[in-house]
């Protein structure tokens, strides 16, 4: 089942005023922003040599410590590369150069640490912030996947961008969960009509807010 979050695209956490943003963006850890009990930054965006340089990668191939690339179609021309972003982002960017591409989808799948699901309840809100550079405007579909018991709930938000900051907020309270424990979370960054475009993800963070406690 898929739920679309009604929250505004700017999100509820202002990372620009997060005192711990510098250390967190540089090393993947640091003080948490206000009202958050867990935060994560993908290793691709702070670890040296974390991103594999790949020409014509196969679908399902690992491209970093926590990321895989998925797509359909057999005649796509895709390159994966590391990029040095401008100031204000992480020290490393994950780049995709997409040329001829006839498939229906292209997606970056990020494995989220198990700690994200520990102590989580249905009264939880997640915010995903992504910094991007694109040659041409593009639509991202940010999807949070939550496994509980033997079921997976998905929360999807579409964001259009010409580059810069995009944000999606996923409120688990809008889904009716059956009895069971939360066990796993992963994040998909799906790209609509990616052909003839150069897309660089300069940063990706995921924040957890237990709103039921307030």
Residue spans for each PLM region:
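Activation corresponds to long, low-complexity, non-globular regions
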Residues: 1-73, 213-214
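Short carbohydrate-recognition loop motifs
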Residues: 83-106
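Secreted extracellular polysaccharide-interacting domains
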Residues: 98-121, 149-151
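Extra-cytoplasmic beta-strand recognition segments
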Residues: 113-138
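Extended, low-complexity, turn-rich repeat/linker tracts enriched in Gly/Pro/Ser/Thr and Asp/Glu
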Residues: 131-140, 177, 193-196
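Short, surface-exposed beta-strand/strand-loop-strand elements in extracellular ectodomains
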Residues: 139-148
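Extracellular carbohydrate recognition and processing domains
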Residues: 149-182
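Extracellular beta-strand ligand-recognition surfaces/modules
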Residues: 172-214
């Amino acid at each position: 089942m898929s739920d679309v979050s009604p929250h505004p695209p700017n999100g509820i956490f202002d990372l620009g005023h997060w005192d711990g943003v510098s250390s967190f963006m540089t090393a993947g850890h640091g003080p948490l922003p206000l009202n958050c009990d867990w935060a994560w930054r993908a290793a691709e965006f702070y670890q040296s040599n974390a991103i594999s340089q790949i020409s014509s990668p196969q679908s399902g191939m690992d491209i970093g410590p926590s990321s895989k690339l998925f797509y359909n179609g057999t005649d796509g021309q895709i390159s994966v590369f590391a990029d040095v972003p401008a100031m204000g982002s992480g020290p490393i960017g994950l780049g995709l150069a997409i040329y001829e591409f006839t498939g229906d989808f292209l997606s970056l799948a990020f494995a989220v640490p198990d700690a994200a699901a520990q102590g989580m309840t249905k009264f939880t809100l997640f915010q995903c912030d992504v910094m991007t550079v694109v040659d041409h405007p593009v639509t991202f579909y940010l999807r949070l996947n939550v496994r509980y018991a033997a079921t997976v709930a998905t929360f999807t938000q579409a964001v259009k961008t010409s580059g810069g900051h995009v944000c999606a907020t996923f409120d688990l309270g809008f889904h009716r969960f059956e009895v069971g424990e939360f066990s796993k979370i992963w994040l998909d960054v799906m790209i609509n009509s990616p052909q003839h475009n150069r897309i660089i993800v300069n940063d990706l963070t995921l924040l957890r807010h237990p709103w039921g406690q307030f």
